[in-house]
Design a protein with these regions (language model features):
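Conserved NAD+-utilizing ADP-ribose enzyme module
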Residues: 38, 96-100, 109-274
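Short, flexible loop/turn elements at secondary-structure junctions
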Residues: 59, 86, 109-111
């Protein structure tokens, strides 16, 4: 199987990329999976040598992103939220059932301070601690309240020194998975598995004022709500169905729940979190 990584705006031409044979055997159930795999391999090969192409889904064309123009209650607080997948951007653009646009940008991160939450030095609880800080509508039971406090005291990363954050996107269904872990109803292993459902991939969030000068608008492509609103709804529905099936599976006695994390005073660096 061969995928082509498209030419960048500055003319840097990646070569044809052969996908390893092991990926051929994976059941690719989502329409944008191949695009996501190709992007991941391309980024690994280029190692940041080339500027990135990112997309922002919105109801209108955004030629000049506005610093702190988003909601503070987004996953990582104020920021300009983008993805490397034009298909996902179109879904986000039509999330209210109306037509929108996938705005295309060139982004150069080489001189920026980037926090990649999916890199080996971090774990899913670092991501979750940030989510508990910025997202609202968490359960109010005692375990959930204690869990939020524990996560923020032991796993919260100071994002102020960073210009850009790369990490999971907590769409509605994915946020509910995170809520279940914080409430103590699913294990850490099941949360990690759930975050891979639906192939949402990563989002790239421009946080600092300096980072906004590293984004250049290229163009915008219309997103038809009759197509992409349904795709987003289907993705969410299938992820929830898959999650419910996974949730019914018997937990191993060795699996970690949030209450175990608190009782055993587990912190960053514990091998059980990897």
């Amino acid at each position: 199987m061969v995928l082509f990584c498209p030419k960048t705006r500055r003319g840097n031409q990646p070569h044809l990329t052969s996908i390893p044979h092991r990926i051929d055997s994976i059941s690719l159930q989502r329409y944008n999976t191949l695009n996501y795999i190709a992007t991941a391999i391309y980024r690994k090969q280029t190692k940041g040598e080339y500027p990135m192409i990112v997309y922002h889904g919105s109801s209108h064309i955004v030629q000049k992103p506005v610093y702190n123009g988003s909601k503070r209650s987004n996953d990582y607080g104020y920021g300009f939220y983008t993805t490397e997948s034009i298909e996902l951007a179109k879904e986000w653009a039509c999330s209210d059932g109306q037509n929108g646009f996938a705005n295309k940008y060139e982004a150069d991160l080489r001189s920026l301070n980037v926090l990649n939450l999916n890199s080996p030095e971090y774990n899913i609880l670092n991501w979750l601690a940030l989510l508990t800080r910025y997202r609202s509508y968490w359960q109010k039971n005692s375990i959930a309240e204690d869990a939020k406090t524990y996560l923020q005291e032991n796993f919260l990363i100071d994002v102020d020194p960073f210009d850009v954050i790369i990490g999971y996107r907590a769409d509605d269904s994915y946020f509910s998975f995170a809520q279940d872990f914080v409430a103590g109803t699913i294990s850490l292993a099941k949360l990690s598995e759930a975050m891979r459902l639906g192939k949402l991939g990563e989002q790239i969030v421009f946080k600092s004022k300096r980072s906004f000068s590293h984004i250049s608008f290229i163009d915008a492509e219309p997103a038809d709500a009759s197509i992409y609103y349904e795709r987003k709804a289907t993705r969410d529905r299938e992820a929830r169905q898959e999650y419910r099936r996974s949730k019914k599976a018997t937990d191993s006695i060795n699996e970690l729940f949030i209450i175990d994390t608190m009782r055993e005073n587990i912190k960053n660096g514990d091998p059980r979190l990897q």
